[in-house]
């Protein structure tokens, strides 16, 4: 299992719950189609699962 994940914001945060916006910001994303790599930890997985409908997630090999 990879220890990094590539996370891409594919939908807008406008009109979303404040907690969901904070999760996206916590993952290091600000703009649509912006990507970043995060460590594969339970904390990050929890944030990703909470806002999965806004994101595209890939394992980095």
UniProtKB/Swiss-Prot annotation:
The record's disulfide annotation reads none
Annotated source species: Dichelobacter nodosus (strain VCS1703A)
Subunit note: Part of the 50S ribosomal subunit.
**GO MF terms on file?**
structural constituent of ribosome
User: Which GO terms of the cellular component aspect does the record hold?
Assistant: cytosolic large ribosomal subunit
**What does the entry give for GO biological process?**
translation
Q: Which family does it belong to?
A: Belongs to the universal ribosomal protein uL30 family.
Q: Which Pfam families match?
A: Ribosomal_L30 (PF00327)
Record InterPro entries:
Ribo_uL30_ferredoxin-like_sf, Ribosomal_uL30_bac-type, Ribosomal_uL30_ferredoxin-like
Which NCBIfam families does the UniProt entry name for this protein? rpmD_bact
Instruction: Quote the protein name from its UniProt record.
Output: Large ribosomal subunit protein uL30
Q: Which HAMAP family match?
A: Ribosomal_uL30_B
Q: Which gene encodes it?
A: rpmD
Keywords attached to this Swiss-Prot or TrEMBL record, sorted alphabetically, are: Ribonucleoprotein, Ribosomal protein
């Amino acid at each position: 299992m990879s220890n990094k994940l590539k996370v891409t914001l594919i939908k807008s945060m406008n009109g979303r719950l404040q907690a969901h916006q904070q999760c996206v910001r916590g993952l290091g994303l600000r703009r649509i189609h912006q990507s970043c790599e995060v460590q594969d930890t339970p904390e990050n997985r929890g944030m990703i699962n909470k806002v999965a409908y806004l994101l595209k997630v890939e394992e980095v090999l």
